[in-house]
Swiss-Prot record:
In the transfer reaction, the free carboxyl group of lipoic acid is attached via an amide linkage to the epsilon-amino group of a specific lysine residue of lipoyl domains of lipoate-dependent enzymes. (R)-lipoate binds at K134. The keyword Cytoplasm applies. Belongs to the LplA family. This is Lipoate-protein ligase A.
Length: 338
């Protein structure tokens, strides 16, 4: 019986793909070597220890229907579209070795006619007339008895959109967490016009088989056809949840300030696990009672635009004469935290 396993995802859902990765990683025999090939539709994928409000333009992502997905490995934020080919290599220890998986990807690129080199800890680069360009980035995760190496190959990604979603708004966030490093990148189709996702997957799979000296049939998976993965429904529910993707962010503070016709307002939030743990308000409004009540009401709320907007709107019952002010506050706060 082969110790290799090759899975290819037919789904573009990042939460599905990351849940499959997590489930297989947890339940695979320690003697198995797995290659999982996949790609995501428009998604920003952040590292396990990152703050999405700090790393991403969350407002633009919401407007453009770009998903956020937190992965279980470390590293920085990346934008995925269907021009990215994603790979995951998994193995038990002591077999797990990210040098082996890196060399498999390099061999795959070489077989396609692309000469690439490993650079630094995580990147694969190609030499161009303009200097080195990154075509692949990776991240890693290890437990006591197994490890995985996953990464992306920039095939034909819309590089103009990288800056749209990975340059965060200039929000006043005093945030902890790992900050992403931006690199100069290139698409493989600039070197090999017409190169397809299927060709890249085939090349990586062949290099995988060649390294281990055996072959297996690919298992094609999708939400309609998943392998037998224990607790997959629970893993998918977590991976797709706001609590994991946003709420898992390191603690941070957010300062909002705005001047309205009726006065200036400063709101200070401390946020932990996606919930507001402390709120302070400062205002020169002639009637500060609504703002003070709002600060009290927002404490304990989820740091989500719609939740904070509901809290603001609920105060209009208590302060009917300040309804217009509260409407303006509600719209401002909701816009600021998106």
């Amino acid at each position: 019986m082969s110790t290799l396993r090759l899975l290819i995802s037919d789904s573009y859902d990042p939460w599905f793909n990351l849940a499959v990765e997590e489930s297989i990683f947890r339940q695979m025999p320690a003697t198995q070597r797995v290659l999982f090939l996949w790609r995501n539709a428009d998604t920003v994928v952040i590292g396990r220890a990152q703050n999405p409000w700090k790393e991403c333009n969350t407002r633009r992502m919401e407007k453009d229907n770009v998903r956020l997905a937190r992965r279980s490995s470390g590293g920085g934020a990346v934008f995925h579209d269907l021009g990215n080919t994603c790979f995951t290599f998994m193995a038990g220890k002591p077999e797990y070795d990210k040098t082996i998986s890196t060399n498999i990807v390099l061999a795959a690129l070489n077989s396609l006619g692309v000469m690439a080199d490993a650079s630094g800890r995580n990147d694969l680069v190609v030499k161009t007339a303009e200097g080195d360009r990154k075509v692949s980035g990776s991240a890693y995760r290890e437990t006591k008895d197994r490890g995985f190496h996953h990464g992306t190959l920039l095939l034909n990604a819309d590089l103009s959109r990288l800056a749209n979603y990975l340059n965060p708004d200039k929000k006043k966030l005093a945030a902890k967490g790992i900050t992403s490093v931006r690199s100069r990148v290139a698409n493989l189709t600039e070197l090999l016009p017409g190169l397809s996702h299927e060709q890249v997957c085939q090349a990586v799979a062949e290099a995988f088989f060649a390294h281990y000296g055996e072959r297996v049939e690919a298992e094609v998976i999708s939400p309609d056809k998943t392998p037998d993965l224990p607790n997959f429904a629970e893993t998918f529910a977590l991976q797709s949840s706001w609590e994991w993707n946003f709420g898992q962010a390191p603690a941070f503070s957010h300062l909002l300030d705005e001047r309205f016709t009726w006065g200036g307002v400063e709101l200070h939030f401390d946020v932990e696990k996606g919930y507001i743990t402390r709120t302070q308000v400062f205002t020169d409004s002639l009637n500060p009672a609504p703002q003070e009540a709002l600060a009290e009401r927002l404490q304990g709320c989820q740091y989500r635009a719609e939740i904070l907007q509901q809290a603001c709107d609920a105060l209009r019952v208590d302060f009917p004469e300040q309804e217009k002010e509260l409407q303006e506050l509600s719209a401002w706060i909701a816009g600021a935290v998106r």
